[in-house]
Amino acid sequence: MANNDQKRDEGYIEKLVQVNRVAKTVKGGRIFTFTALTVVGDGKGRVGFGRGKSREVPAAIQKAMEAARRNMIQVDLNGTTLQYPIKSAHGASKVYMQPASEGTGIIAGGAMRAVLEVAGVQNVLAKCYGSTNPVNVVHATFKGLKTMQSPESVAAKRGKSVEEIL
């Protein structure tokens, strides 16, 4: 498991979550290929993830970064934390994320931490249950962040004021 921080000119924070080597056995021996899982974000609520496959590690990482930039979503944050507690699942991975007070930091492990860091969340309590496969944890985290809505957006959809909703 690797963990890199890189800044690009576009202002995106890129993190490498996982590199995995797989082997295909053929008549002449084994063919090794690599898969990379990366997350990309601007630190202000835009975040994306991608997977890339190649015979070389750098090429797999590059493909994953490009896929992550194409697969970006906007997350409605409440300052530096989440709007409300979120439960989400993908496959056998289940994640729970809850807003935290200022100064708490990111209390999350592994793949979930990488997603929350690049999304711009600075105060959160998070826990992963079930499978801790990084691919499924990232998917579950994204599902949860994608479903989260701010009170302003809910009020606008219902045609009411924020005070009526809260």
UniProtKB/Swiss-Prot annotation:
- S5 DRBM domain span: 12-75
Q: Which superkingdom does the taxonomy of this entry point to?
A: Bacteria
Tell me which Gene Ontology terms the entry assigns under biological process: translation
Protein name according to UniProt:
Small ribosomal subunit protein uS5
Which GO cellular component term is one of those annotated? small ribosomal subunit
Q: Which UniProt keywords apply?
A: Ribonucleoprotein, Ribosomal protein, RNA-binding, rRNA-binding
Describe its function.
Answer: With S4 and S12 plays an important role in translational accuracy.
What the entry says about domains is: The N-terminal domain interacts with the head of the 30S subunit; the C-terminal domain interacts with the body and contacts protein S4. The interaction surface between S4 and S5 is involved in control of translational fidelity.
The similarity annotation says: Belongs to the universal ribosomal protein uS5 family.
Look up and give the organism this protein is from: Ectopseudomonas mendocina (strain ymp)
Fill in the subunit field for this protein.
Part of the 30S ribosomal subunit. Contacts proteins S4 and S8.
Q: Is RNA-binding one of the keywords UniProt gives this record?
A: yes
Molecular function as annotated in GO: rRNA binding; structural constituent of ribosome
- The chain's coiled-coil residues are none
Q: Which HAMAP family match?
A: Ribosomal_uS5_B
Q: What InterPro entries does this protein map onto?
A: Ribosomal_Su5_D2-typ_SF (IPR020568), Ribosomal_uS5 (IPR000851), Ribosomal_uS5_bac-type (IPR005712), Ribosomal_uS5_C (IPR005324), Ribosomal_uS5_N (IPR013810), Ribosomal_uS5_N_CS (IPR018192), Ribsml_uS5_D2-typ_fold_subgr (IPR014721)
